[in-house]
C-alpha cells in the first residue's frame, strides 16, 4: 500500500511518472483536474458548484476542492493506496489536506518532489505545446505558470521537509532513471511498513 503526493512544477514529468506508478503499484492516479471534470460531467451537487466557478473563470475554492477530494478518497479503488497530483498548491491547502487525511485515517506516506531546472522546464513545455498544438501555452503563459508555482507552491517543500516526508528526485535525467529512483523510494516505504 502506498499513499503518495506527486509534486513538481509544470513540465517536471509528474504525469509521466504517475502513469509508471499506477502500473507499478496498481493504485489510482487522482488529479484535481480529473476530479473537477468528473464531478461536472456527472452533475453531482459538488460538480454543479465547480461548474459555476469554472464558467465564471474563477478558481475553485479550497473548501470545495477538499470536499471533492474527500468524496474521491471514499471510493473503493483507493483501498490499496493512491497518487495525488495537482494538490495541494498552497500552504492553506496542505494544512486542509493534512486535516482531511487524518480524519479519514488515510495519511500519506511520502511527497515525491520532481526537481528540474527552470530553463529545462521551459524547453519541455514549449516542445509539448508545439507537439500537442496547444496555442494557449505560449512562452509568456509558460513563464506565468512557472512563476505561480515558484511563488505559491514551491514553499510547500519546506512544510513537507519539516515533517520528514519529502523525497526529492532529480527529474532532469532520462525518464527510466527517474522511474527507477521513484521505485527505490517506494520499495523503501514497503520495507518501513513491514518492520
UniProtKB/Swiss-Prot annotation:
Short name of one Pfam family: ADK
Top-rank taxon: Bacteria
Chain residue ranges for the region called NMP: 31-60
Task of the protein: Catalyzes the reversible transfer of the terminal phosphate group between ATP and AMP. Plays an important role in cellular energy homeostasis and in adenine nucleotide metabolism.
NCBIfam families for the chain: adk (TIGR01351), PRK00279.1-3 (NF001381), PRK02496.1 (NF002700), PRK14527.1 (NF011100), PRK14528.1 (NF011101), PRK14531.1 (NF011104), PRK14532.1 (NF011105)
Species classification: Bacteria, Bacillati, Cyanobacteriota, Cyanophyceae, Gomontiellales
Assembly: Monomer.
Catalytic activity: AMP + ATP = 2 ADP
Any one cellular-component term (Gene Ontology): cytoplasm
Tagged with keyword Transferase: yes
Name of the protein this chain belongs to: Adenylate kinase
Subcellular location: Cytoplasm
Entry note about domains: Consists of three domains, a large central CORE domain and two small peripheral domains, NMPbind and LID, which undergo movements during catalysis. The LID domain closes over the site of phosphoryl transfer upon ATP binding. Assembling and dissambling the active center during each catalytic cycle provides an effective means to prevent ATP hydrolysis.
Residue positions binding AMP: 32, 37, 58-60, 86-89, 93, 134, 145
Protein keywords: ATP-binding, Cytoplasm, Kinase, Nucleotide biosynthesis, Nucleotide-binding, Transferase
Residues annotated for ATP binding in this entry: 11-16, 128, 173
